[in-house]
Amino acid sequence: MSWDQVWIDVNIATMDPEISAPYGAITDAAIAVKEGKIAWMGPRSELPEFDVLSTPVYRGKGGWLTPGLIDAHTHLVFAGNRANEFELRLQGASYEEIARAGGGIISTVKACREASEAELFELGRQRLNALAKEGVTTVEIKSGYGLDTETELKLLRVARELGKHHHVDVKTTFLGAHAIPPEYKDNSDAYVDLVIDEMLTAVINENLADAVDVFCENIAFSLEQTERVLSTAKAAGLDIKLHAEQLSNLGGSAMAAKLGAKSVDHIEYLDEVGVKALSESGTCATLLPGAFYFLRETQMPPIDLLRQYEVPMVLASDYNPGSSPLCSSLLMLNMGCTLFRLTPEEALAGMTRNAAKALGVEDSVGVLKPGMQADFCLWDITTPAALAYSYGVDVCKEVVKNGKLVHQ
């Protein structure tokens, strides 16, 4: 056999549902890589003969390989910070009160409008590096802090550039309908017209987005406005997704599911009607424990219903300056278990297999098996559950992206 590299003395959490063992585990395993893809994988005792003199062999010292982590919901391209609002919230102000007073998203919009592409790129690069050190190999980045055509395009251009200059794959999402800008506060329908007629057209013309998202909520966009944006995006051939049921239940998840959305995100107030709609459409439910924690929310997502209806559960950081300034995917694994009562296996699936489905890349990443992209991490742990159990110690020892060792 002729391979580019071989890994031995490892255990593999493949996350492949076709393998019945927990985590799709193969113990005392080996994995071979050829031309950026997994060429062979299985028990080490069954490893075919290969040229050991010409093939790099890496020894995992009994650690665990997992698929590269996928953070399927971030807002990591932004300027400024909102530490002052953190103080206000702790003094009793609500997220809605801050937003209606011109704070929240709008304060970050001002900072992003003033920042240059170079400044935004450097800030984004630092944050992407932080995620990459924790084993993230694919990430989604949303716009939404421009709320005018020029700045929305600027944010998406920066996200695209990050993908070109970093080993982490970047999927971009246009979120022009993130909040109603001050200049349209008395005419939100006119802003929706701008999002559809001008912003989205420009985004498509420059090929800046893989998907389109909307914040469907009482403080943002109505169900009807949301459907207008998503329907237009779908007709243009873009994937669609939705911030839904975070603060109330407007029925956004059910509507998005009927349109074929890849995911609906937050969903603390999702009801059984919405869960059933997700199940029927194959739409993923993205859980964002960072925002739940940071905003000190008490309404839990309907985890048991999602299990009952077998809706794929995704776990993501929602990294952003206002409601989840927590740039750590490993922390989300722990929070997913401690706050939402996911099992460690469900949490890891939410950052691998299911996250890939939410981004539409499940044919290439998210599980480890022959033919898939060689994106994987070596962890200095004795069980995959340790990734969710403990936090703060660097256990990510190696990262392979597209068959290349990128972190050692």
Curated annotation (Swiss-Prot):
<feature type="binding site">
    <location>
        <position position="73"/>
    </location>
    <ligand>
        <name>Zn(2+)</name>
    </ligand>
</feature>
<feature type="binding site">
    <location>
        <position position="318"/>
    </location>
    <ligand>
        <name>Zn(2+)</name>
    </ligand>
</feature>
<dbReference type="InterPro" id="IPR006680">
    <property type="entry name" value="Amidohydro-rel"/>
</dbReference>
<dbReference type="GO" id="GO:0005737">
    <property type="term" value="C:cytoplasm"/>
</dbReference>
<feature type="binding site">
    <location>
        <position position="320"/>
    </location>
    <ligand>
        <name>N-formimidoyl-L-glutamate</name>
    </ligand>
</feature>
<keyword id="KW-0378">Hydrolase</keyword>
<dbReference type="GO" id="GO:0019556">
    <property type="term" value="P:L-histidine catabolic process to glutamate and formamide"/>
</dbReference>
<keyword id="KW-0408">Iron</keyword>
<comment type="similarity">
    <text>Belongs to the metallo-dependent hydrolases superfamily. HutI family.</text>
</comment>
<feature type="binding site">
    <location>
        <position position="75"/>
    </location>
    <ligand>
        <name>Zn(2+)</name>
    </ligand>
</feature>
<comment type="function">
    <text>Catalyzes the hydrolytic cleavage of the carbon-nitrogen bond in imidazolone-5-propanoate to yield N-formimidoyl-L-glutamate. It is the third step in the universal histidine degradation pathway.</text>
</comment>
<feature type="binding site">
    <location>
        <position position="178"/>
    </location>
    <ligand>
        <name>4-imidazolone-5-propanoate</name>
    </ligand>
</feature>
<keyword id="KW-0369">Histidine metabolism</keyword>
<feature type="binding site">
    <location>
        <position position="246"/>
    </location>
    <ligand>
        <name>4-imidazolone-5-propanoate</name>
    </ligand>
</feature>
<feature type="binding site">
    <location>
        <position position="73"/>
    </location>
    <ligand>
        <name>Fe(3+)</name>
    </ligand>
</feature>
<keyword id="KW-0862">Zinc</keyword>
<keyword id="KW-0479">Metal-binding</keyword>
<feature type="binding site">
    <location>
        <position position="323"/>
    </location>
    <ligand>
        <name>4-imidazolone-5-propanoate</name>
    </ligand>
</feature>
<keyword id="KW-0963">Cytoplasm</keyword>
<dbReference type="GO" id="GO:0005506">
    <property type="term" value="F:iron ion binding"/>
</dbReference>
<protein>
    <recommendedName>
        <fullName>Imidazolonepropionase</fullName>
        <ecNumber>3.5.2.7</ecNumber>
    </recommendedName>
</protein>
<feature type="binding site">
    <location>
        <position position="318"/>
    </location>
    <ligand>
        <name>Fe(3+)</name>
    </ligand>
</feature>
<dbReference type="GO" id="GO:0008270">
    <property type="term" value="F:zinc ion binding"/>
</dbReference>
<dbReference type="GO" id="GO:0019557">
    <property type="term" value="P:L-histidine catabolic process to glutamate and formate"/>
</dbReference>
<dbReference type="InterPro" id="IPR005920">
    <property type="entry name" value="HutI"/>
</dbReference>
<feature type="binding site">
    <location>
        <position position="75"/>
    </location>
    <ligand>
        <name>Fe(3+)</name>
    </ligand>
</feature>
<dbReference type="InterPro" id="IPR032466">
    <property type="entry name" value="Metal_Hydrolase"/>
</dbReference>
<feature type="binding site">
    <location>
        <position position="145"/>
    </location>
    <ligand>
        <name>N-formimidoyl-L-glutamate</name>
    </ligand>
</feature>
<feature type="binding site">
    <location>
        <position position="243"/>
    </location>
    <ligand>
        <name>Fe(3+)</name>
    </ligand>
</feature>
<dbReference type="InterPro" id="IPR011059">
    <property type="entry name" value="Metal-dep_hydrolase_composite"/>
</dbReference>
<dbReference type="GO" id="GO:0050480">
    <property type="term" value="F:imidazolonepropionase activity"/>
</dbReference>
<comment type="pathway">
    <text>Amino-acid degradation; L-histidine degradation into L-glutamate; N-formimidoyl-L-glutamate from L-histidine: step 3/3.</text>
</comment>
<dbReference type="Pfam" id="PF01979">
    <property type="entry name" value="Amidohydro_1"/>
</dbReference>
<feature type="binding site">
    <location>
        <position position="322"/>
    </location>
    <ligand>
        <name>N-formimidoyl-L-glutamate</name>
    </ligand>
</feature>
<feature type="binding site">
    <location>
        <position position="145"/>
    </location>
    <ligand>
        <name>4-imidazolone-5-propanoate</name>
    </ligand>
</feature>
<feature type="binding site">
    <location>
        <position position="243"/>
    </location>
    <ligand>
        <name>Zn(2+)</name>
    </ligand>
</feature>
<feature type="binding site">
    <location>
        <position position="82"/>
    </location>
    <ligand>
        <name>4-imidazolone-5-propanoate</name>
    </ligand>
</feature>
